[in-house]
């Protein structure tokens, strides 16, 4: 066809003629040059030695990667393996910080000063101190007990007068907790306290015979008598008073069986307006009156429509009935004794000596034997948390610089983006499922290193507004400081009923040494102690970090976005399926040549069934690693004679996560099967170690890799007159939702250790 003046070719020639075309040869785009310098720091030298000690080069990675990286490792005993594991001894670090700390004499006392003083007071007051009886009496007065003990049976007061002065503890706990129906508000919750030292209801469970039981009770009665004598040497009937306290404690403790046996009944955990609740308590117990007086101590006026929940109402009512029919002097004696027991472990002085004598004579210790300084740390930080936040502040300042938190977040951001890209750029999921998966990924919260308030001294000081700071001195007996701190914590929690401030769960604070996904709050947690020192080394190869820690974080993030009851296109998984079912069908099954179908033909096949989160962990971590070295335009390599390039180090770090005792809970056999199978499906691994192309052993002629679609169940028509049943079911479902069982169903929590640098 000839181009005419009015034809399309004519206009094309005119257009080309009008363009300025540069015919000079184009310069090639300069590639970003990545530097891979050798890391000569001590940490890298130790890591290089570890790999040379544990990698077995007589077994090729292509034949058996697990044996290649774990054969030598697995032969080590637990002590030998522990030197390669990342372990932070928080207790040792805290002892060092608190023992060597100094306090500025002229400056205003801060929260961190208080934990230093309290710790040193505890260590110092292990022995005797002056005016011990007066110190203990003042402690009891602080809890509303003006005189202890009293003669039973001579009371001129009723039980309400006693409880109005002392509060409900140690009979009942009154706590401020989050409202289940409204996660941003607080409410009141009442439950049985049961602070008993002896196993009154479970002697047999502790392997205690009847003969030994009587010996323990005799020694316990003597302990009470000795404490009475310490406070009131001239008090008559000490033995009788001690016996009455012990017998009442035993009878009250036996009510705990109602809790352990979970006595069933209608409305066991009612939630009502506090003024109405008395109608459902024993003899219309005036709980509104008593709690109103208690909350006045923090300037809160309880309203009659304040909601309160009673946990196990039958148990609580049994305790209230016992209170109402008991002599008020005996009630006060019991309450005073329980309070003394609360402080006796670290009381020091003669009180501590009497406690030791009891344990020696009874040959029974209610708790694990510990050094004195360990008991002091427990009382302030690790068991009780009255001084957790200031201690954490000191630890973070010394051992966890902000750069570690920043680098950890950077790693996570790379992994999250890699996973988001994987979700969005696929052809095996429906668009609505993609959107839901991405939304779920974006909703995950991260607590990395520490919560910011731990490094805010102004905020930390507000946590101790009810402490008489002038009385917190090295000369103050620890039992006095301890009681002030406990009382302060109690009052601050009461105050939160009005402020709606959420109680911090210190179990997952900076001292938490494990990586953890909390399904209840949809939060991935890697606190300071779990990653301390890992990101602080400037030259530590990123291939090592991302292959090990990065793979574990990638696994846990992939697990967080798995969710039940989402259907995907061409899903071959019966029943409820995970959001990743389509991914598994497209990738996992395709790579394994329709493993589901093949397994139906070969039921004896031992190929491990691997969930997508495990399958994709190393892939996501590697993509994140690539982004990390782009960010820094390079990485470091290890020193040594053995040549280990960056890609190989990544897979070595990942592979050794599967070694014995290195973190995963699989058996050696399971770990070997899983790791080898995963690596055979990883094309980059195969290329890195020059392995031959993998052909699945179950591949057979005729397999067409057809995914069998899920058969939908027919919906049953509801029967007539089922309104009452449906209402009951609705109530049960509501309870299930409130107890967050849905989150538990899709949690599959795994706690993973970190291999040491």
Q: PLM ranges: what are they?
A:
Residues 73-77, 197-199, 534:
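Short, solvent-exposed loop/turn elements at domain surfaces
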Residues 23-92, 757:
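Signal-peptide-cleavage-adjacent N-terminal segments of secreted and extracellular proteins
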Residues 5-20:
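Cleavable N-terminal signal peptides of Sec/SRP-targeted secreted and luminal proteins
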Residues 33-35, 245, 251, 271-283, ...:
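Intrinsically disordered, low-complexity linker/terminal regions across diverse proteins
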Residues 57-61, 181, 516-520:
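Extracellular/periplasmic catalytic domains that process cell-envelope and extracellular macromolecules
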Residues 54-75, 203, 207-229, 431, ...:
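Hydrophobic/aromatic-rich, well-ordered segments within soluble, folded domains that form packed cores
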Residues 55-62, 83, 87, 91, ...:
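Solvent-exposed, acidic/flexible segments
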């Amino acid at each position: 066809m000839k181009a005419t003046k009015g034809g399309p070719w004519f206009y094309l020639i005119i257009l080309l003629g009008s363009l300025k075309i540069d015919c000079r040869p184009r310069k090639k785009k300069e590639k970003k040059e990545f530097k891979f310098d050798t890391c000569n720091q001590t940490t890298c030298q130790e890591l290089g030695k570890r790999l040379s000690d544990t990698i077995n080069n007589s077994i090729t990675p292509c034949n058996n990667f697990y044996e290649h990286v774990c054969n030598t490792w697995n032969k080590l005993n637990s002590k030998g393996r522990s030197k390669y594991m990342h372990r932070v001894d928080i207790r040792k670090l805290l002892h060092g910080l608190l023992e060597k700390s100094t306090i500025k004499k002229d400056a205003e006392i801060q929260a961190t000063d208080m934990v230093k003083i309290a710790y040193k007071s505890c260590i110092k007051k292990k022995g005797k101190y002056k005016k011990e009886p007066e110190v203990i009496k003042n402690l009891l007065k602080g809890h509303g007990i003006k005189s202890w003990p009293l003669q039973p049976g001579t009371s001129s007061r009723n039980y309400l007068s006693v409880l109005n002065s002392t509060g409900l503890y140690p009979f009942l706990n009154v706590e401020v907790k989050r409202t289940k129906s409204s996660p941003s508000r607080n409410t009141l919750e009442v439950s049985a306290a049961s602070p008993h030292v002896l196993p009154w209801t479970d002697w047999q469970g502790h392997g205690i015979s009847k003969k030994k039981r009587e010996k323990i009770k005799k020694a316990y009665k003597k302990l009470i008598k000795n404490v009475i004598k310490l406070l009131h040497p001239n008090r008559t009937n000490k033995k009788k008073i001690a016996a009455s306290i012990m017998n009442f404690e035993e009878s009250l403790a036996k009510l705990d069986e109602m809790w352990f046996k979970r006595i069933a009944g209608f409305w066991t955990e009612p939630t009502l307006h506090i003024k109405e609740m008395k109608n459902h308590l024993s003899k219309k117990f005036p709980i509104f009156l008593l709690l109103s007086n208690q909350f006045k101590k923090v300037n809160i006026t309880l309203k009659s429509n304040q909601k309160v929940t009673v946990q196990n109402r039958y148990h609580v009512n049994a305790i209230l009935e016992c209170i109402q029919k008991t002599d008020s002097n005996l009630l006060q004696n019991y309450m005073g004794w329980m309070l003394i027991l609360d402080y006796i472990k670290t009381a020091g002085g003669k009180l501590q000596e009497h406690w030791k004598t009891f344990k020696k004579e009874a040959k029974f210790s209610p708790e694990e034997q510990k050094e004195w300084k360990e008991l002091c740390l427990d009382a302030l930080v690790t068991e009780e948390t009255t001084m957790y936040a200031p201690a954490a502040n000191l630890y973070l300042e010394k051992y966890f610089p902000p750069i570690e938190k920043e680098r950890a977040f950077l790693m996570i951001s790379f992994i999250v983006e890699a996973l988001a890209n994987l979700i969005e750029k696929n052809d095996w999921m429906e668009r609505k499922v993609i959107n839901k998966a991405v939304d779920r990924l974006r909703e995950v919260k991260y607590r990395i290193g520490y919560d910011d308030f731990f490094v805010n001294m102004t905020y930390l000081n507000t946590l101790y507004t009810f402490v008489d700071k002038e009385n917190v001195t090295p000369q103050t007996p620890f039992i006095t400081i301890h009681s002030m701190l406990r009382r302060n914590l109690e009052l601050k929690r009461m105050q939160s009923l009005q402020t709606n401030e959420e109680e911090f769960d210190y179990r997952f604070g900076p001292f938490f040494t494990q990586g953890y996904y909390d399904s209840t709050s949809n939060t991935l947690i890697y606190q300071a102690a779990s990653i301390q020192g890992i990101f602080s080394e400037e030259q530590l190869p990123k291939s090592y970090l991302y292959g090990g820690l990065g793979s574990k974080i990638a696994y846990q993030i992939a697990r967080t976005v798995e969710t039940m009851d989402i259907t995907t296109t061409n899903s071959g998984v019966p029943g409820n399926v995970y959001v990743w079912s389509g991914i598994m069908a497209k990738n996992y099954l395709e790579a394994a040549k329709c493993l589901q179908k093949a397994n139906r033909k070969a039921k004896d096949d031992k190929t491990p069934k691997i969930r997508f989160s495990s399958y994709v962990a190393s892939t996501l971590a590697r993509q994140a690693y690539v982004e990390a070295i782009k960010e820094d335009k390079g990485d470091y390599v290890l020193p040594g004679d053995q040549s280990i390039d960056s890609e190989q180090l990544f897979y070595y770090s990942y592979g050794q996560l599967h070694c014995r005792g290195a973190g995963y809970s699989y058996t050696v056999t399971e770990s070997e099967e899983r790791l080898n199978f995963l690596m055979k499906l990883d094309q980059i691994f195969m290329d890195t170690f020059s392995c031959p192309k993998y052909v699945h052993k179950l591949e057979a002629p005729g397999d067409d890799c057809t995914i069998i679609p899920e058969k939908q169940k027919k919906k049953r028509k509801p029967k007539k007159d089922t309104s009452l049943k449906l209402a009951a079911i609705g109530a049960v479902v509501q309870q299930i939702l409130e107890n967050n069982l849905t989150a538990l169903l899709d949690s599959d929590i795994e706690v993973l250790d970190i291999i040491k640098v």
